[in-house]
Amino acid sequence: DKSVSSTHFSIDIEQLLADGKTIKIKPQGYSMYPLFVPGRDEACIERTDFSSLKRGDVILYRRDKSILVLHRIWKITDNSLYMVGDNQTEIEGPLRADQVRGKLTGFVRNGKFVDVKNPIYRFTSSLWLFLRPLRPCFWKLMSVLRK
């Protein structure tokens, strides 16, 4: 395993994945909050085939001539993906198969590895994906409760 900060994303990370290596990155920003908290969590990613992807998977992909992004699959069509961050409501897409670099296999939180096959993770991530249209209401309620 090689741990690399996502601020240093480069062709090297893409090459490591292409070579079949599992990488660990520390996601930056809050687009995948509450799954990932910047500075706390590490995402474990490995190469994947487009045909093995399913709704709810978190994948690493490259936007056209732009940055690498780690978001969740909202919808899959025959040859396209539609993505959403866990802290977002806007759907991004369509993405092509050639933009996919890898898939989340687990993450490290407070020194402990959590596999994406973990039943609690699967349930909460499926529920959060289902509740996408209600996220703004949820965050508004949380801000009121914190006061």
Predicted regions and their residues:
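Extended hydrophobic leader/signal-anchor segments used for secretion and membrane insertion
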Residues: 1-147
